[in-house]
Amino acid sequence: MLGRPMKPSKCQECRDRAAWLDMFTALALAVFKTALGVLSGSMALQAHSLHSFGDFLTKGINLASVKLSSRPANSAFPYGYGKVQFLSANFIGISLMAGAAAMLWYNVTHLGSGHVQVPEVWAVFGALISAGTAELMHRYLRCVAEHTNSPAIMAAAADNRGDAYSSLAVLAGIVLSILGWVAADHLAAILVSLLVLRIGAVIAWDSIHGLMDGSVPSHRIDGIRQLLAAHHPGVSVVDLRGRRMGETWEVDLQLSISSQVTVEECHALTRELESRIAREEPHACHIRIRFIPQSGDATKTAVIETAAAVDEFAYLVEASAALRPLGHSRNGG
């Protein structure tokens, strides 16, 4: 999947397939860890299975948001449904934080009450399988997210990386508990909770950034600026900004050009710039370009050059003064 960006239809197929695979993988891991955690007596593995069940539910919502964001724009939503993926990512982040807080409370209270037990040795294999599966899913989803620019899939990738790290913490706790440190299993579960809490906060904050029209990455903006400087050195960039709209971006560009450029030339330049920017940045699907005259040209066009023009200007001033209401005069009289 590495290389040049895929075509939009291919991107959507790959993105949808990744969302389905992620959801059912979460369900399979949840069932597997629950069964093995109960049979082996590992509290950390049982706590981790609850997190996986929560993953399954949130990823179902994630899949629905990915499907909804593919709907074409209409009169009600002229820019499309892309931002629904930020809502989905926000829900995933909040759900992760809520589940982590519950898991943290559960293990702290059990550890404080002294209700600890040593897990069986086969719990080690469950933690290993969980860590390996989560890491593979993370790499696959991250690859898909980088090509499709999907915030929902990127959130799912980060979630799986958190699962991989937390599974390693569970593995360490199980091994230490078997070797004689009985409380290690619960301490590992507490560490898992704190890690998942942090991942959820990062996902939630990034989604809020997108919902509040956060800027596209600064290096992408710099790339567009360099593109203009390289191919159109006679055009000055007055303002260049971009915002995230789910998988796509909106780029707002204000350029300063000579007042001698005709309207037809402006239209031709606009089409050329839109095409060039779209080729370099495939996710820039909404490009708005405005032109203003260069400062020196603007000053020249504002100068009144002939006596006839001066007389006409004075006549307009007198006419406007005659039509002005008395209450609006400068001295109030």
UniProtKB/Swiss-Prot annotation:
Subcellular location: Cell inner membrane
Up-regulation conditions: Last member of the probable 18 gene mamAB operon.
PANTHER family on file: MITOCHONDRIAL METAL TRANSPORTER 1-RELATED
Inactivation phenotype: No visible phenotype, magnetic response and magnetosome formation is wild-type. Deletion of genes mamH to mamV (amb0961 to amb0978) gives cells with no magnetosomes and no magnetic response.
SUPFAM superfamilies noted in UniProt: Cation efflux protein cytoplasmic domain-like, Cation efflux protein transmembrane domain-like
Gene name of this polypeptide: mamV
GO molecular function: monoatomic cation transmembrane transporter activity
Protein name as catalogued: Putative transporter MamV
Species classification: Bacteria, Pseudomonadati, Pseudomonadota, Alphaproteobacteria, Rhodospirillales
Signal peptide (residue range): none
Membrane-related topology note: Multi-pass membrane protein
Keyword terms, alphabetized: Cell inner membrane, Cell membrane, Membrane, Transmembrane, Transmembrane helix, Transport
Membrane-spanning segments: 19-39, 86-106, 111-131, 170-190, 191-211
Function summary: Expression of just the minimal mamAB gene cluster (amb0961 to amb0978), including this gene, is sufficient to form a minimal magnetosome chain with small magnetite particles.
Matching InterPro entries: Cation_efflux, Cation_efflux_CTD, Cation_efflux_CTD_sf, Cation_efflux_TMD_sf, CDF_Transporter, Magnetosome_CDF_Transporter
GO cellular component assignments: plasma membrane
Family membership noted in the UniProt record: Belongs to the cation diffusion facilitator (CDF) transporter (TC 2.A.4) family.
